[in-house]
Amino acid sequence: MIYRIISHIPSIFFKPAYDLYERYLLEKVKAGVIPKHVAIIMDGNRRWARKREKPPWYGHFFGSKKLEEIVEWCHELGIRILTVYAFSTENFKRSKEEVDRLMKLFEEKFRELVTDRRVHEYGIRVNVMGRKELLPKNVREAAEEAERVTRKYNNYFLNIALAYGGRSEIVDAIKDIVNDVLEGRLKLEDINEEIVRKYLYVPNMPDPDIVIRTGGEVRISNFLLYQIAYSELFFVDVYFPEFRKIDFLRIIREFQKRERRFGR
């Protein structure tokens, strides 16, 4: 189901009222059913930077800081799985300078995750999902190190879609299934939805309850095509670096009011 939220940054004069409203929402949300899995299309970094007459990577940096905040929000609410769309296979078509800057940022952030106190204190497992072979060697190695160091954790999960495409994920799953059938490890008649799920980039992960897209665009952009068949979709008219906790809480609160039918 699609739900659109229009969000505006409040004037500093209204901050006390917003803080009060945020605390009210937090209490309401904590009293309701908490989603297990939230997925976010982190859109609007470049437009946010352009509005400030800054280069794209300025927006990407502040987008990465916003993601750190969202991880904290999820921990506070007990949302165990967070999946974020960081870089699509189509994003490689951007300018070389922007892609190179992004790759440098990804490498830095993966290396920070390895030593981040919160990752180890909260027990966050990091999964990098996508065609990793398309990534530069240094980024791939940093991503794999973050996965290796956090592999033993299972309190929370941070799935980072990098060099990712929903169609590519399905194609890669089909190839692996066909290979296992040909090798005799899988029978054709045994293939069902749950079997397919085991061949996705992050096997057996519960489907997202909620998909949020920031930036004002109303589309899913090839994100988690297999997994979001029954997810609740929320589109927010605010660039990702400006996404507020109050916006997040309003989405969760709206989700809690829904009767999910799962196609019935």
Curated annotation (Swiss-Prot):
Protein name: Tritrans,polycis-undecaprenyl-diphosphate synthase (geranylgeranyl-diphosphate specific)
Binding residue positions for substrate: 44-48, 60, 88-90, 92, 94, 213, 219-221
Cofactors demanded by this protein: Mg(2+)
Keywords on record: Magnesium, Metal-binding, Transferase
Positions annotated as active site in the UniProt record: 43, 91
SUPFAM superfamilies: Undecaprenyl diphosphate synthase
EC top class, as a word: transferase
Metal-binding among keywords: yes
A Pfam family matched in the record: Prenyltransf
Single GO molecular function: ditrans,polycis-polyprenyl diphosphate synthase [(2E,6E)-farnesyl diphosphate specific] activity
Annotated Mg(2+) binding sites: 43, 232
Source species taxonomy: Archaea, Methanobacteriati, Methanobacteriota, Thermococci, Thermococcales
Species of provenance: Pyrococcus furiosus (strain ATCC 43587 / DSM 3638 / JCM 8422 / Vc1)
Secretion signal, residue range per the UniProt entry: none
Protein task: Catalyzes the sequential condensation of isopentenyl diphosphate (IPP) with geranylgeranyl diphosphate (GGPP) to yield (2Z,6Z,10Z,14Z,18Z,22Z,26Z,30E,34E,38E)-undecaprenyl diphosphate (tritrans,heptacis-UPP). It is probably the precursor of glycosyl carrier lipids.
GO biological process: polyprenol biosynthetic process
Gene3D superfamilies in the cross-refs: Decaprenyl diphosphate synthase-like
Cofactor note: Binds 2 magnesium ions per subunit.
Annotated family: Belongs to the UPP synthase family.
CDD domains: Cis_IPPS
Domain of life: Archaea
Assembly description: Homodimer.
EC number assigned by the record: 2.5.1.89
Catalyzed reaction equations: geranylgeranyl diphosphate + 7 isopentenyl diphosphate = tri-trans,hepta-cis-undecaprenyl diphosphate + 7 diphosphate
Disulfide-linked positions: none
